[in-house]
């Protein structure tokens, strides 16, 4: 991915990653939401690739707390491996927020600007969504409007879940209406969490009203605090994003994002690449000698109807799938072993999972290093938006429906868990 980098190579991108991401638990019980795997990669990696493709080479993670920092640093380090793996040259440089506790996403940006002496315009993106952004077009919009801050706006159907913008004819944001009803929403354009910001925001952080806001609320968040404050002063414009934007902040949103990418040809091309020529709408990853050998074995099984890969299916590297198994509209990550006559539908299976014979997994997420015990005479069911955390052992014949299981737990054989959180 050796592309022209001027003038964007000097621009810094800040990615606040704070909080405990409770809405995604148990997937985030022991790791940052930014590295939760989707399409067989850490979630935030797609943001880095999208921006690096356009010439960005400097990223800073505003990681709050040990779990967020450890998760991000252990995977990305300072960017050398990420750059090599994705063939990005010149390489990407990744920095981290020092151990200075912030009180919100905007406060994290304040800390990063001060610590890394940021004196130029910069971009802020989030670690829990997938997006396509024409950054040069956004910069052109900012230059035309002379906006102090530009907020990326994206169309949404479920306006009740987002902050929705009310703008004037010039694009200036009058206000955001938080989670309005469909009837009262001023528009369908929601805050994407993508911000292009003037370095002059340094002076805003020092204003008495902003300091009082922090003292009173114990918080300085973009959506709740800083953007409303700036919008009241006419300093914020809304940029209508032309590319896709997908929220991945809850298990339901996660599976919805998987479905929407798998079903949309343009999104599939961006996130999955080209499908196999022999199997329409099937992607099997891996380019090493052993990966190719296993890929070819799976293709032969599918072509001879020994396994069924229906709808749109993504399979990771070094997977083993036994006869009679059906995978439909789902993702299976690297190093997974699926037994005989397994059924996986509209689900996401993360890496290094073992699933026993006859198991049925529907509309659910199975975390990393999970063993689903199951047999043809005592099958296990995982259904109804169940979410299984990492390193869980599920006994044969168990039933999980709308259940959540924390990491490292054991679910007994023939257990019946309906709508419960196994903590």
Label the predicted regions.
Residues 43-47, 107-111, 225-226:
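Well-ordered alpha-helical segments embedded in enzymatic catalytic cores
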Residues 70-169, 196, 206:
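Conserved beta-loop-beta/alpha segment of the NTase-like Rossmann-fold superfamily
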Residues 1-10, 200-203, 209-423:
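Left-handed beta-helix
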Residues 2-81:
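N-terminal glycine-rich phosphate-binding loop and ensuing alpha1 helix
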